[in-house]
Amino acid sequence: SVQFKPRL
């Protein structure tokens, strides 16, 4: 699972 998803 991805905890942090940066919005580019």
Curated annotation (Swiss-Prot):
Q: Does the keyword Secreted apply?
A: yes
- Claim: Secreted is one of the keywords in the record: yes
Q: Which UniProt keywords apply?
A: Amidation, Neuropeptide, Secreted
The family assignment reads: Belongs to the pyrokinin family.
User: Where's it found, cell-wise?
Assistant: Secreted
Domain of life, per the record? Eukaryota
Q: Which residues carry this modification: Leucine amide?
A: L8
Coiled coil residues, start to end:
none
Q: Which GO terms describe its cellular component?
A: extracellular region
| Record protein name field | HUG-Pyrokinin
User: Which biological process, per GO, is one annotated for this protein?
Assistant: neuropeptide signaling pathway
Q: In which tissues is it expressed?
A: In larvae, expressed in the brain and ring gland but not in the midgut or the thoracic perisympathetic organs (tPSO) and abdominal perisympathetic organs (aPSO) (at protein level). In adults, expressed in the brain, corpora cardiaca, corpora allata and thoracic-abdominal ganglion (at protein level).
What's the stated role of this polypeptide?
Mediates visceral muscle contractile activity (myotropic activity).
